[in-house]
Amino acid sequence: MELLGSTLTATYAHPRPTPTNFLPAISTMASTYRDRFPHYNLTHSLSLPWRPSTYYKAASNWPTLDPYCTRSQRVSESTMLPFVSNRTTLFTRYTPDDWYRSNLTNFQESNTSRHNSERLRVDTSRLIQDKYQQTRKTQADSTQNLGERVNDIGFWKSEIIHELDAMIGETNELTDIKKRLERALMETEAPLQVARECLFHREKRMGIDLVHDEVEKELLTEVDTILCCQERMKLYLDKAIAQLAANRAAQHELEKDLSDKQSAYRIDDKCHHLRNTSDGVSYFHGVERVDATVSVPESWAKFTDDNILRSQSERAASAKLRDDIQNVLVVTANEMWNQFNKVNLAFTNRIAETADAKNKIQTHLAKTLQEIFQTEMTIESIKKAIVEKSAFLKVAQTRLDERTRRPNIELCRDMAQLRLVNEVYEVDDTIQTLQQRLRDAEDTLQSLAHTKATLEHDLAVKANSLYIDQDKCMSMRRSFPSTLRLVGFC
């Protein structure tokens, strides 16, 4: 019989009473029969906390109750308390058959329970052994996998370290040759300045010497050559800067990957050496459901392999760039030196030509001065001769004038008269001739003076040109950088 809504006065709420002789002692039954019904905690009603809300099952048959009752005994079903204490003592709930069947059922259930328990113990022991072996094998497999993982990480870590060392060495070498390139580029400024100053000084040449000669052509070629070399150096300098940036980027990726590998190596190596008795072993509930992985072994290996391949590619490009920079340093140094020698040779030839022209001008000037002196002496001689001839003319003319005073018939055209007339004409013609020769000599002297001035000016021009080319330009060109400095070595 199942009773609901029992109060705290129920018999099951108090200690178990002492067994009577009506039923066999409980101690005579099997231990498995004792307390075969599980104990239930009584939960209280939410509306009536003093009333339990559970129930229990006493028997499978419902007893027959007295159908007759008085009005005062009629109560609602919700407040009725069908307990033993409220029933009549003449009412019995079970029959002896029920009692024997209950015992038999309990005995059978006891045997079944013991058999099931024994089988459960055997199966459980076997299960424990199987699971223990399986767990140990699983842990061994995990340990082996961790060991293999540690070996893989160690392999890739060594590969990264090897490539990182090579990349660092290559970057250092590229940095060194970049510095050499920068020094070589700085060394080209002095020759360029010298060439430009030579052109500037040669603009101060005078007169006819301000000529577009071979020296000027070679100087302009030298300026163009140095500028072209500077452009190539600057181009390779920009390439070196960009390549250094690429090398450092690849190096950064390798260093980052190496740092991750080292951290992973420490973690996995620690996990690989963890045992059941190790310190720090604890429960982390739900950790197996957290999947924070971002790669698989294939993508993991490919990531590092790509980093190494990228670094190797950048190293190859860096090595090729270093060779190109070395070649351009040698080529530009040779080009500038060859052009420097050409300019110097042109200067030497031009200086020799100018010196020879100057010497010739000096020779002509000396001859001109000598000729001027001779011409001046000639002019003085002509003037003296004219003065001397003037006296003869005056004497002849005076004679003729005096003879005009002869009286009458004495004015005879005699030989003396004729001779005096001829003498006057002859002396006058001589004087005219001498005067013409004097004018010619004076013109010649003026021409010689002009030639002298021209030669002196030309001599000054040549001296100025020689001073510019020999003293100014060639003195500056003695400080041209050496080949070692032009290729970037100190």
Swiss-Prot record:
CC terms in the record's Gene Ontology section: acrosomal membrane; acrosomal vesicle; axonemal A tubule inner sheath; axonemal microtubule; microtubule cytoskeleton; outer acrosomal membrane; sperm flagellum
Compartments where found: Cytoplasm, Cytoskeleton, Cilium axoneme; Cytoplasm, Cytoskeleton, Flagellum axoneme; Cytoplasmic vesicle, Secretory vesicle, Acrosome outer membrane
InterPro entries tied to this protein: Tektin-like, Tektins
Tissue expression summary: Expressed in spermatozoa where it localizes to the sperm head (at protein level). Detected at lower levels in the sperm flagellum (at protein level). Expressed in trachea multiciliated cells.
Keywords associated with the record: Cell projection, Cilium, Coiled coil, Cytoplasm, Cytoplasmic vesicle, Cytoskeleton, Flagellum, Glycoprotein, Membrane, Ubl conjugation
Protein family per UniProt: Belongs to the tektin family.
Name of the featured protein: Tektin-3
Top-level taxonomy: Eukaryota, Metazoa, Chordata, Craniata, Vertebrata
